Amino acid sequence: MHKKIDPQTKELYLQKKGEYKEKIKELVQKKKELLSTDNKDELIKINEKIKRYKILYKNKDPNLIHFKDDYNFDNIFEIDNYNLWYSNKAKHALKDINLGIKKNKVTALIGPSGCGKSTFIRSLNRMHDLTDGVSKTGSIFFLSKNIYSKTLPELELRSKVGMVFQKPTPFSLSIYENIAYALKSHGIKDKIKIDQIVKESLEGAALWDDVKDILFQSAHGLSGGQQQRLSIARAIALKPEVLLMDEPTSALDPIATNKIEQLIHQLKKSYSIVIVTHSMAQAQRVSDETVFFYEGRVLEHGTTKQIFTQPNNEKTKDYIDGRIG
């Protein structure tokens, strides 16, 4: 438990524990009544609710909210009052972020260099856990679950939230093993199943036709654009719900960039996509929604059409028009 807990938080915490205890009793009684019926679907729902309330009841940290009760399930992520510091609080990188990211949409993050875009996108799958001196406050919810709660283990989060980096990151393995390795590391051992997922993932990344005859050759023999599509194939192999893309085309030529952008349009049918881009033209081409970051804050969030044609914030307009950068 944190050392400093204000009395109001502690009082609310104890009140909630009492409510959760009563809710568990009520659900257990309802479960007993349902056991004599054939309503298996309702029993499954009741068991899930009991499990959830037991987690809430056992929570020993009053400052950690495991679930968000009023979560809007049109969103894949909801971020509440999120702050992040680097270098033992020497640098305040993200400031009071409140944001909802919609499901099955492409959301572009734009803003000047150093404004917090990449810091933010890496927060969504806990990549900052690997960085010394990082501290944070506030909450990030993924489908109502706090990503820092034990209700959502880190490995599960990483499998549901895939990441594609600025530069292609093929392993020093064959094209096939680049994808198979990720599957094996997540416990998939059956070769027939692995073969199937490798093929499906390469098809999903529009790469299968390019590599089907050279699957066991080194991935480093692929072009930059092909390597980036391989990175995407590796990310979607685990069947995530979200793809995070941190400037995925900045190291590619215009032809390869165009292929990735076309692929993004296809991928959004199955995945929610968050993309960091410095290209205003790219943001307009690929995204449904746009978020403008400035000096660690979200200054504006709206549909891409609204942000680029009728921005509400003067700084958003100045950035889009090239007056600040």
Curated annotation (Swiss-Prot):
SUPFAM superfamilies reported in the protein's UniProt record? P-loop containing nucleoside triphosphate hydrolases
Q: What are the BP-aspect GO terms?
A: phosphate ion transmembrane transport
A GO molecular function annotation here is: ATP hydrolysis activity
> Any idea of its EC number?
7.3.2.1
Is Transport one of the keywords UniProt gives this record? yes
Residue sites binding ATP per the record: 111-118
Its annotated compartments are: Cell membrane
Q: Which reactions fall under this protein's catalytic activity?
A: phosphate(out) + ATP + H2O = ADP + 2 phosphate(in) + H(+)
User: What membrane topology is given?
Assistant: Peripheral membrane protein
Among the entry's GO cellular component annotations, what is one?
Answer: plasma membrane
Supply the enzyme class, top level: translocase
What keywords were assigned to this record? ATP-binding, Cell membrane, Membrane, Nucleotide-binding, Phosphate transport, Translocase, Transport
Q: Locate the ABC transporter domain: which residues?
A: 79-320
Q: What Pfam families is this protein classified in?
A: ABC_tran
The text of the family note is: Belongs to the ABC transporter superfamily. Phosphate importer (TC 3.A.1.7) family.
Quaternary structure annotation from Swiss-Prot or TrEMBL: The complex is composed of two ATP-binding proteins (PstB), two transmembrane proteins (PstC and PstA) and a solute-binding protein (PstS).
What this chain does, per the entry, is described as: Part of the ABC transporter complex PstSACB involved in phosphate import. Responsible for energy coupling to the transport system.
Q: What is this protein called?
A: Phosphate import ATP-binding protein PstB
Q: State the species of origin.
A: Mycoplasmoides gallisepticum (strain R(low / passage 15 / clone 2))
The organism's taxonomy opens as: Bacteria, Bacillati, Mycoplasmatota, Mycoplasmoidales, Mycoplasmoidaceae
The gene designation is: pstB
